[in-house]
Every structure is written in C-alpha cells, then in structure tokens.
Amino acid sequence: MKFELQTTDGQARRGRLIFERGVVETPAFMPVGTYGTVKGMTPEEVKETGAQILLGNTFHLWLRPGQEIMKLHGDLHGFMQWHGPILTDSGGFQVFSLGAMRKIKEEGVHFRNPINGTPVFLSPEKSMEIQYDLGSDIVMIFDECTPYPADWDYAKRSMEMSLRWAARSRKRFDELQNKNALFGIIQGSIYEDLRDISVKGLVEIGFDGYAVGGLAVGEPKEDMHRILEHVCPQIPQDKPRYLMGVGKPEDLVEGVRRGIDMFDCVMPTRNARNGHLFVTHGVIKIRNAKHKEDTSPLDEQCDCYTCRNYSRAYLHHLDRCNEILGARLNTIHNLRYYQRLMAKIRQAIEEGNLEQFVEDFYQRIGKPVPALSI
C-alpha cells in the first residue's frame, strides 16, 4: 500500500491509498461487511454506490466459516467475490463487546465462542495469522478497546497492554512475510497524556497507517473532538489516519475537519434496515404514516438506484410489509448517501472551501457548526 497526500485545507487532507487491487480516494468511508457481506447487497451493488474499500470482521469470519474454508477460495476476496481492497479489524472490538464472556490476560483473550459456547483463545499472533489467511489489504493490530467510562489507571493499564500487543502483532506480521499494510491503533480513552504515550510508542514500532481507537464508545462528542484535535497532529503526515467505528454523517465531517482520512461504521446499513434514511436535509423515518401517499423520491438530489426508480410511498409500503426488498433499497440509498457525502468533502478540500461546505451542510440539517479548536 502507498499513501499519497495530494492537498490540504486547514487540517483536512485529500489523498489516495494505492493498492494492487485498486485506488481508494480519501477521505474515504468503508462499508462494513461483517460476515463477508454488506448485509443484503451483492458486491456489484456495493461498488455501484461508489465504495472502493470494504471492512471485514476477523473475529466473526474466524469463528464461522473459519480459516480453512477461506483458504479453499484463496482468501476473503475470492470467498465473497469483492475484488477491491479489504481492511479487516483484528477482533479486539468484538472481544470488548463480549463483556462477561471474556477474560483478558497478557498472553491474549480467553472467551466462549458466542455460537456454540466452546472455549476459544485469541492473541495478537493468532489475529495476524487469521488476517494473513483472509488476504486483508490492511491488517489491524490486535488491541484492547478500552471501555467508556474508564478511570485513568485502568485506561493506562489497558493502553500499555495494547502497546505490548502492538509490538507482538508487528513481529508476527513480519514473520509471516505479509506484504500488505499493517495499521497501529492509538488508545488511551479520553486522556490526552495517555494518547500521547500511545502515539509515541506506536510510531516507534512503525506502522503503515494509524487508527484512532476507543472513541464512539459512549463518550460525549466534545471529548471525541478534543482527542482527535490532540492526536491527529502527532501522527506522521505521510501516513493515513483511520477513525474506527465512526459514524453519523456529522461525525465524518468533524473527523475530516480534524485530519482523519478513513472511516467505517455499520450506521448506514443498520439504519437502512430500520427505515432511518439519510437525505440532504437530515433523516427520514420511512415508517412514518406521512410517507404513505408521498410519490416523491427519498432525496431529489440523490442519483442512487432507489431514488431514480421508487417513491417514498413504495418504500413505506415495503417497510410496513417487512419486505426484504425494502431493506435492500434502503441500504443502497444510505450507502450512496455516504459515498456522495465523501465525494463532496473531497471536492471541497480540493477547492479549498471545506469550511463553507461544512457551514452549508449544518445549515441544511438544521444544526449548529461545532467549534474547531485546532
């Protein structure tokens, strides 16, 4: 992987990630394909929304179908028939989500398989091996996603262990002679001094990109913004920056304003299945009775397959009848909305008028522009 930084506007960056499997224009949004599928979508449909890179889930694909079945197809690309780049998370967040089912120790994490209850062990080394078999274009180190709230002492212990796990991840990745990219993950909760130690430690180990982890886990937005403003300037300029698990359209805008290049989130797909649809002026809840007789498209400005062909009334009807097609059409629209948003952000950075774009964006959705302290 090669990262080209083309231009900046304030802290915002316009660049490209270049892989053998294709180019990703940044800032980029990555749809989430947890089980080797973006729910309800074919790879061709996902590509048509404008997505250039997907996120796959190491933890879930390891438990089912497993590494051996993946290897029968070559790797995850061959298995799911997505021929662009894939980033895989390391399993750290899923382990964090298991709560009482897991036991975190220095060597790794012991937990019960949520599918059948059998004991399982995941370590930094094992995560690197699974991601190698998946053929991930971007591999994430294995870390502990520090929960929120966490006091300073717990956050410090967690961050320090994540640093040791980062070094072990790097070592195993290199032993496997993996030619793809490996990203470090910055932890430290909402504490700037802990984030400083984490960034410094990761940069010393050396990675192809750096992710900001442990945000969007329940902390106030002001804390997320403050941490991004503090951390991003410390990340080497020539490396891509990835904000994990974020987020709402406003979160993407705010991340870009603070120097983030990459995002992923289940929000567009999950919200689509629940009838929450993103449009130019905010959010439409298609379940509401007011859409029952509305012959207009979801969004006059959207060029997606759904908006070109179907009315709000039809989408309301599909939702009320619990039809699978409704979830699919909603997902196509929401993913296209996110890709259109990123394309407009990239254009605004190129033209040097991102702050004007930000002002217009918030005006349309009826919210104030968050303060920028950087």
Swiss-Prot record:
Cofactors demanded by this protein: Zn(2+)
Free-text cofactor note: Binds 1 zinc ion per subunit.
Chain positions recorded as Zn(2+) binding sites: C302, C304, C307, H333
Top-tier EC class: transferase
Keywords noted in UniProt: Glycosyltransferase, Metal-binding, Queuosine biosynthesis, Transferase, tRNA processing, Zinc
Recorded superkingdom: Bacteria
One annotated Gene Ontology cellular component of this protein: cytosol
Metabolic or biological pathway: tRNA modification; tRNA-queuosine biosynthesis
Record-level GO BP terms: queuosine biosynthetic process; tRNA wobble guanine modification; tRNA-guanine transglycosylation
Gene3D superfamilies (UniProt xref): Queuine tRNA-ribosyltransferase-like
InterPro entries: ArchSynthase1/Queuine_TRR, TGT, TGT-like_sf, tRNA_ribo_trans-like
Pfam family, one: TGT
Keyword Transport part of the UniProt annotation: no
GO molecular function, one term: metal ion binding
Protein role: Catalyzes the base-exchange of a guanine (G) residue with the queuine precursor 7-aminomethyl-7-deazaguanine (PreQ1) at position 34 (anticodon wobble position) in tRNAs with GU(N) anticodons (tRNA-Asp, -Asn, -His and -Tyr). Catalysis occurs through a double-displacement mechanism. The nucleophile active site attacks the C1' of nucleotide 34 to detach the guanine base from the RNA, forming a covalent enzyme-RNA intermediate. The proton acceptor active site deprotonates the incoming PreQ1, allowing a nucleophilic attack on the C1' of the ribose to form the product.
Subunit structure: Homodimer. Within each dimer, one monomer is responsible for RNA recognition and catalysis, while the other monomer binds to the replacement base PreQ1.
Matching PANTHER family: QUEUINE TRNA-RIBOSYLTRANSFERASE (PTHR46499:SF1)
Family classification: Belongs to the queuine tRNA-ribosyltransferase family.
Protein's recorded name: Queuine tRNA-ribosyltransferase
